[in-house]
């Protein structure tokens, strides 16, 4: 967005954050203290900070393509007194994560913004450790009172099909959000 500063404020909007329920999402993911996590499309850190508190002996890679989002995150990390967050400037084709390194990749309200998603998520598989997971939180399809207009969202079933093509199987879904789908995927063994 052209006005990144106002976009950052929108992302940190108290009502939006409350609807996303970051603490509950992080708890549901049952991460070990020493887990290595990537928050893909981290923005100013709505999920990065709760993730970092959960994996207190691990690392959270805060991955974003917008440097000013990462600058906003750095300020919030200093305020939160956390030292296990690594900001990573990504490109639209790769998040720049090491191979076979990450236990969980969390993607919140970012999936629809990625280009060539099947190939992108196929590449992400190589960055997961054995047993690694991909968690996606994305606005539900159709007309909603909040979130992006319907023309910016994927049709029902489209994300699932893309992820299957990219080599993932749906592990489970959580029903804790009124306006978001919350899914956990794992690399398919027969891919």
Region roles according to the model:
Residues 1-32, 36:
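Class I SAM-dependent transferase core
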